[in-house]
UniProtKB/Swiss-Prot annotation:
Positions bound to Mg(2+): 230, 251
A molecular function GO annotation: GTPase activity
Enzyme class at the top of the EC tree: hydrolase
Database matches in Gene3D superfamilies: P-loop containing nucleotide triphosphate hydrolases, Probable tRNA modification gtpase trme, domain 1, tRNA modification GTPase MnmE domain 2
Summary of subunit composition and partner proteins: Homodimer. Heterotetramer of two MnmE and two MnmG subunits.
Protein role: Exhibits a very high intrinsic GTPase hydrolysis rate. Involved in the addition of a carboxymethylaminomethyl (cmnm) group at the wobble position (U34) of certain tRNAs, forming tRNA-cmnm(5)s(2)U34.
Organism of this sequence: Chlamydia trachomatis serovar D (strain ATCC VR-885 / DSM 19411 / UW-3/Cx)
Protein name (record): tRNA modification GTPase MnmE
Required cofactor(s): K(+)
Amino acid sequence: MLRNDTITAIATPPGEGSIAIVRVSGPDAISISDRIFSGNIAGYASHTAHLGTVSHNAVCIDQALVLVMRAPRSFTGEDIVEFQCHGGYFACSQIVNALLAEGARAALPGEFSQRAFLNGKIDLIQAEAIQQLIAADNIDAFRIAQNQFQGHTSQAISSISSLIIEALAYIEVLADFPEEDIETEDSLPKHRIMEALSITDELLSSFDEGQRLAQGTSIVLAGLPNAGKSSILNALTQKNRAIVTDIPGTTRDILEENWVLQGKNLRLIDSAGLRETENLVEKEGIARAREAMSQAEGILWVVDASQPLPEFPTILYQKPTILLWNKCDIVSPPQIEVPFQQISVSAKTGEGLLELKQALQKWLNTTQLGKSSKIFLVSARHHSLLHSVYTCLTAALNGFTEHLPNECIALDLRQALHSIGNLSGSEVTENVLGEIFSKFCIGK
């Protein structure tokens, strides 16, 4: 990728809006922008804003507010100019065309963030957090990404790296001076490796919880056919997402719907009604329903209050479960003793849905991020590389127990540092960078 040219792109989403932003970055950002602006951008101080007119070939394009950020005190570390013009498509696209005509190049997806990384303004972990911030669809995903962007994850990785480097330096001294009788069983390198292992293990153990928080808590609606599972899904999400009929066995596959409740993300899963059947398609749907129940973090067991009480599967007693007595608008549910919460609802009238939402909110509040700086891994790339670090550190630690040569232990530590380099970006390949930043939007 060329790093000595100047790039431009629209930085705001397409469509109607009050303001659109065109971003320019590179060594000629100021001179190129100056040629299409009525003011004197070349003479403006850094971090100042100026109102003027954007024109090209003697044709006025729009009135715009220009922001000037000079290198190295900018997001990319280069000279940056931003044009804030009227929203919509035409004004910003014509400004981009004018900038291209004056010598700028159209930016690639994520190229502004990539330049920030290459110029040392952010590390790769922080760069990836930018995309996570943009893609966050619930408050927990946003907070996890915000913590990562603020550098909390990077600081933990840096601590691991420092401990490994300290251990490696000590071991290399032992390798260089084998004649010295230095006891290593309880030595500094072993303790440093154990400290690094502890931090690595803590990060790895946060992955499942981080995934749950970012992607949403999975809750299955399960029960007999025609109990009202699909109707309750539609009522909660206020969408006609699931097909509803009076024919038993209408739902024959897993249907998943993301639903944000008070900023928290849930994955509501509608499933096939559980019953004995000879229909091969329905039988497969029931098998998938049971699998979904086994993997879900919670179950809404839906019962038609007007029908005989069905047998409760064992799994209801093994997971957080709420018993939903549906059709309470036409019949009062029976009084039974069960070890989980019971709520009377009506998918038809909406009765009881507020109580159900409040119960679900309590489930979701089990893990509260709040303003905490707790680190959660959510990236599969980060998890894979940290797992490699953990494996190498474990091998190095075992090397002490097995009295392996110091050179072997040092080799494991160097491999751990290599994985950390790939994680932070200090040793990452150009192909990996291309893959990561290609997922970004143009203009970011």
